[in-house]
């Protein structure tokens, strides 16, 4: 098999508002935007071990907790026996090599992007014939952000618990990302939001946000106004205050901040 490098891009949340709750999950409305300058690289390489599933790369978690492995298990669950055997045979011969550039626990979707890219790699290499909608359905079992990365849009309105992804046609902004050396727990941030900050956005505001360009949205809102998780994250991780700078916005549950680079005058 000819070795090919696949890029798994980061994302930022231009805005992230909570619409309500669904059991233990929160329903959101958010504008996801791809960051072309920040990506992990994935490839299949010949295996050197007898492990059922081999990952090569710098990971801070056990294999069973890795989103790529979770995507592998979810893919097998979805496929019929014959197609599942093709996937298993592939992983008996090849390992997944990952060059990590996207910081983890940072609100940039690195793990979700890796999982989505792995699913697309398997679909392409093995000619599984899965549609984007089917891949997104599989990916949702791995994480709420995975469907966005499956579709590969530059920009999209994401709602529900992540399963509704609607392309938003606009130019990509030149995003600069800054990630403090802090590991943020997304569940803890959401739990504190529900306990102390719960104030769902109304339907009229949801529709307005879905129509506004990302550039205009950022111009009109502060970091706290744009992201409902900013306040609980700051309360939980007080060090974040020391890293916040005027003109920067907060992505996901953190810890990353981002801004739009100013165009240089020539």
From Swiss-Prot:
InterPro entries registered for this protein in UniProt: GHMP_kinase_C_sf, GHMP_kinase_N_dom, IspE, Ribosomal_Su5_D2-typ_SF, Ribsml_uS5_D2-typ_fold_subgr
Active site: residue positions: 11, 145
Gene3D superfamilies named in the record: 3.30.230.10, GHMP kinase, C-terminal domain
Covalent S-S links between cysteines: none
Biological pathway: Isoprenoid biosynthesis; isopentenyl diphosphate biosynthesis via DXP pathway; isopentenyl diphosphate from 1-deoxy-D-xylulose 5-phosphate: step 3/6
One Pfam family linked to the record: GHMP_kinases_N
GO-annotated biological processes: isopentenyl diphosphate biosynthetic process, methylerythritol 4-phosphate pathway; terpenoid biosynthetic process
Keywords assigned by UniProt, alphabetized: ATP-binding, Isoprene biosynthesis, Kinase, Nucleotide-binding, Transferase
Family as reported in the entry's similarity comment: Belongs to the GHMP kinase family. IspE subfamily.
Task of the protein: Catalyzes the phosphorylation of the position 2 hydroxy group of 4-diphosphocytidyl-2C-methyl-D-erythritol.
Protein name: 4-diphosphocytidyl-2-C-methyl-D-erythritol kinase
